[in-house]
Amino acid sequence: MGYSPSDVVKLIQEKDIKFIDFRFTDTKGKEQHVSVPGHVIEEDTFTEGKAFDGSSIAGWKGINESDMILLPDPDSAVLDPFMDETTLLLRCDVIEPATGQGYERDPRSVAKRAEIYLKSTGIADTSFFGPEFFVFDSVTWNIDMSGCAYKVDAEEAAWNSGKEYESGNMGHRLGVKGGYFPVPPVDSAQDLRSAMCLAMEEMGLKVEVHHHEVATAGQHEIGVGFNTLTPRRMRCKILKYVVHNVAAVRQTATFMPKPVVGDNGSGMHVHQSLGKDGKNIFAGDLYGGLSEIALYYIGGIIKHAKAVNALTNPSTNSYKRLVPHFEAPVLLAYSAKNRSASIRIPYVNSPKARRIEVRFPDSTANPYLAFSAMLMAGLDGIQNKIHPATAMDKNLYDLPAEEQANIPGVAASLEEALRALEADHDFLMKGGVFSESWLEGYLDVKWAEVQTLRVTTHPVEFQMYYSL
């Protein structure tokens, strides 16, 4: 990328770009957009921005103070491969007109403040993330006064092994927890994932790997390579956009953590490391080849994990994944290579690649907020020398109950995570990265989600209680 405003204007002219799509991210992490004709974009657009109504975005402005500005980032310019008309995407900061500064509740502005705070420490941040997702052939749901229900289906799902198809049932299906990772024809989505990866590469991402994941019914993972803080979050948005749109040709993709009952859920494993003066300061001669700084970083994440869960696992559905027996990282421990721990130290060939993998996040997270929160927790651990105690090299899933009781766990529900965030958020406020205004708006949005589920009768309640 590396575009300047003049580069973007030149690109619009050279490529005869018809439309510019201004994109920004709301509190929940969903991208929003507004399009303008390409010919109206001038260099001044990148300093003056475009006005919009902020009162329509949940958790933001009231109608009495709704004017806001979208300020496009020229360095984010990328052609959209899915639009019929030639369209250039520009991701935007949301600006407060009264101050000319990034809006306190704008997730992208939060991420930029985190980057500024990180630079003030003289440290750099890199990461690799691997989101998991499902691709279904169909999905339906219904919620009204007469009842509620949902239904997902995928031809490759284990439950379709006895289904009659017009062209015949060819078998070759994945069993429950059997998706990791046989070759085609059992893996029926090799070409689909390849098409996704090619589109991601076209949009500037560096794809590291793709494969079928553990669950039946079309669970997959695509890993995207290391990069610095703000571009990483932008790449996460591109990845989700590509997955949704490539799948939408004939199917439907979801990043919900637990759309299928009885099989593994989908996470977003985030690999992180810190560097200073060109050196990886996570590399050392302590446990797992880590430095003392890396251990303190882990200690900060473990200490603040339940509050961080409110941002890394911000949906009620997140906690249907974070339960025992489905390879979910529910215990706050760290270990070299051990995937049952919530923080893993992967094997690497060189100390330059030394990193940690935080395994509890999922892709309902707003990446601008989630990655910033993990960073702030880790930096707090370094600043306060929070040691994470002894590493756990045992299979944590097989520990007796009395041993498990001595290991802290992630939040068990969104409600618990929000309570933790209410009580433990000072580490987020350092350097003005997050603010009390942001916290108020975020909690309003998320408590409303908790309340929606709380007052909605669930079908399984009929199974448990109808005949009592």
From Swiss-Prot:
Main location: cytoplasm
Gene3D superfamilies, sorted: Glutamine synthetase, N-terminal domain, Glutamine synthetase/guanido kinase, catalytic domain
Domain GS catalytic: 107-468
Pfam families xref list: Gln-synt_C (PF00120), Gln-synt_N (PF03951)
Gene Ontology process terms (BP): glutamine biosynthetic process; nitrogen utilization
Top-level taxon of origin: Bacteria
Top EC class, one word: ligase
Domain GS beta-grasp: 15-100
One CC-aspect GO term: membrane
Positions that bind Mg(2+) 1: 269, 357
Keywords (A to Z) from UniProt: ATP-binding, Cytoplasm, Ligase, Magnesium, Metal-binding, Nucleotide-binding, Phosphoprotein
Subunit structure: Oligomer of 12 subunits arranged in the form of two hexameric ring.
PANTHER family: GLUTAMINE SYNTHETASE
Protein family (similarity comment): Belongs to the glutamine synthetase family.
Protein name per Swiss-Prot or TrEMBL: Glutamine synthetase
Species: Acidithiobacillus ferrooxidans
